[in-house]
Amino acid sequence: MTNQNLETNLETILNRALQGYDLSPAETLLLLSPTTKPNLGKLALTELPAEITAIQKTADQLRQQQVGDTVTYVINRNINFTNICEQHCSFCAFRRDDGKTGAFWLDINQILAKANDAVQRGATEICMQGGLNLQAKVAGKSLPYYLQLVREIKNEFSHLHLHAFSPQEVQFIAREDGVSYEYVIAALRDAGVHSMPGTAAEVLDDAVRRIICPEKIDTGTWLEIVGTAHRLGMPTTSTMLCGHIETPKQQILHLERLRSLQQTAIEKDYPARITEFILLPFVGQEAPAPLRRRVGHDQPILLDVLLLTAVSRIFLGNWIINHQPSWVKIGLDGAKEALKWGCNDIGGTLMEEHITTMAGAIGGTFMEVKNLQEAITSLGRNYQQRDTLYKYL
């Protein structure tokens, strides 16, 4: 394709997006094609090709049209209650075998102490996830253990929003106890879990999953569990682990599956939906060596992340309006830049974060509210605290 033809096609595609049309996967793939993506890692933000700048400006304009100029944030705390895990994902530096150096499993008093500390600092949300610990049972059953965690937290802090337990954890509990996904989700919901993290998605393409996380749930199971959550009234987030072995085509397939999932929830009038999309760039600093060698870089390539951020807004924005970068993975400066490439939310304070930090991420584990606010105002945008479901506080 000549440069002139590329520019014409890009202009047509971007104009369609600005007019409110959903782009096809083929159209969207052109935005990530090698012709528009000439070794971005070596370019400065001030010397981008015209094609990349056009994509960035389109994403920024769509963000403004779809959700406005206000940038939101949430005061929350991550609690990773155990890193003991039966699985061995090739990108994970977090998991440990029981009894090995670095393994941990918090008891309920430690979890409550962390929740109390979060409340004292103004948190409205606890995000709680952990490894798949086969010993995490009550009377030989997994679900009662998880329900006990939820009830103890809710008994002490009834106002806290519990954003807890990924689709992978739901499948693990269901498998261990021989019950359905619906049974597990309904029980967690009734105990006080208000929403489900859309993690463990990685890339929703089984060819990728067989290499990077062969023990994890497959694409169909992830989609089934998230769709079941929506049907049962439990909102979810959505994520993509990017920048490792996946191709642009597989990235677009992932986005297409998320869009279709959200369309189903809306068309069937389910009581819950996907609330946000978060791009999670691969961090390989401390990841297992085989994948590090295959990927060829230990930290995210910022411009690659920004381009995919923009393309995600362009492809998903009609259906999933809230887009968030990961300051843990790309740093606060990178997250601030992402607010110009289609993101409207800067995420949360977290207060602690183990999974990405143990992989070697540069962003740290805690962000003061004032730092988030200053990052937003430095762009000439207004900030607004929100809750987990994007209600202004």
UniProtKB/Swiss-Prot annotation:
Keyword Zinc-finger: no
Alphabetical UniProt keywords: 4Fe-4S, Iron, Iron-sulfur, Metal-binding, S-adenosyl-L-methionine, Transferase
InterPro entries, alphabetized: Aldolase_TIM, CofH/MnqC-like_C, CofH_family, F420, FO_synthase_su2, rSAM
Keyword Transferase on entry: yes
Biological or metabolic pathway of the protein: Cofactor biosynthesis; coenzyme F0 biosynthesis
Radical SAM core domain boundaries: 71-318
EC number of the protein: 2.5.1.147
Gene Ontology MF term list: 4 iron, 4 sulfur cluster binding; 5-amino-6-(D-ribitylamino)uracil--L-tyrosine 4-hydroxyphenyl transferase activity; 7,8-didemethyl-8-hydroxy-5-deazariboflavin synthase activity; iron ion binding
Known cofactor(s): [4Fe-4S] cluster
Gene3D superfamilies: Aldolase class I
Free-text cofactor note: Binds 1 [4Fe-4S] cluster. The cluster is coordinated with 3 cysteines and an exchangeable S-adenosyl-L-methionine.
Catalytic activity: 5-amino-6-(D-ribitylamino)uracil + L-tyrosine + S-adenosyl-L-methionine = 5-amino-5-(4-hydroxybenzyl)-6-(D-ribitylimino)-5,6-dihydrouracil + 2-iminoacetate + 5'-deoxyadenosine + L-methionine + H(+)
Pfam families (alphabetical): CofH_C, Radical_SAM
Residues annotated as binding [4Fe-4S] cluster: 85, 89, 92
Subunit and interaction comment: Consists of two subunits, CofG and CofH.
Cross-referenced NCBIfam families: CofH family radical SAM protein (TIGR00423), F420_cofH (TIGR03551), PRK07360.1 (NF005609)
Function: Catalyzes the radical-mediated synthesis of 5-amino-5-(4-hydroxybenzyl)-6-(D-ribitylimino)-5,6-dihydrouracil from 5-amino-6-(D-ribitylamino)uracil and L-tyrosine.
Family to which the UniProt record says this protein belongs: Belongs to the radical SAM superfamily. CofH family.
Name listed for the protein in its UniProt record: 5-amino-6-(D-ribitylamino)uracil--L-tyrosine 4-hydroxyphenyl transferase
